[in-house]
Amino acid sequence: TSMQYKDGYYTKREACVIMTCFSTAAFSFIFILTRTCGLEAYFLPAVFAIYAAVIPCAILLPRVWPLSVQKDEYAMESPEIKEDIPEGLSKGQWALKCAVEKAETMTVKKFVLKGVQTIASVWFDVLPMVMFVATTGMIVNEYTPVFKFLTAPFVPVLNWMGFAEAEVAAPMLLTGFLDQFLPVAMANALTAVDTRFFIFCVAIAQIIYMSEIGVMMIRSKVDFNIGKIFIVFLERTILSMPIIWAYTRLLIH
């Protein structure tokens, strides 16, 4: 998405919306995480609950602040993209024609170089940040009361929803901002299956985490700072919670 923005295909607002709302975990990744969390028997219910939450998020969040106020402007250095459809061609025909012309410009050399650049970016940019943020997050969660203090308002909400171990589960709703895997790994400490299922599904539905997506957004020059990223993360969490709670009651009990 960042490359598409730089190439002039998306405006800043479109790029931010796609990065924060139009991404979700693949089935295979969800299955691996269910095994990590001891929920492999609930793989299909988890998929239903997660997708039931992320679709409303994708519909509603682009219409509220801060995504709604992002500027609809293209990158300064990007070439002008012609989007007008010529007369006599349908959208499908014009799209196919553009796709063929674009494919003709790609050579094996360009393809290999682009692949090498992508994997190098993952190895040297993303992985070090993932390890740093995840390790720091685990240390802060295990040895300080920071997350317990910040997530104190969630405890009565989880109690009202009928989840056991609310005080233990509440910090897991916020650690997902650092890395998506943190709440999944921490959920193993929960003995109540419904609470573990709820935390697991919310963690996957949150999508936005600083160890990867957050860092990429900040580096992509779409004018979306860490404060705005955190607000969208909270919005996704708050919107996802009642939906996943309903599915938990329906599918687990």
Which sequence ranges carry the predicted segments?
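Hydrophobic mid-bilayer segments of alpha-helices in multi-pass membrane transport proteins
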Residues: 51-56, 93-98, 127-135
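A cytosolic-side transmembrane-helix exit/cap motif
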Residues: 63-72, 169, 222, 248-253
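Intrinsically disordered, low-complexity non-transmembrane regions of multi-pass membrane transporters
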Residues: 67-120
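Transmembrane helical segments that form the transport core of multi-pass membrane transport proteins
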Residues: 100-191
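Flexible hinge motifs at transmembrane-helix junctions and intramembrane kinks/re-entrant loops
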Residues: 59, 63, 147-148
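C-terminal transmembrane helix pair
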Residues: 2-40, 44-59, 180-253
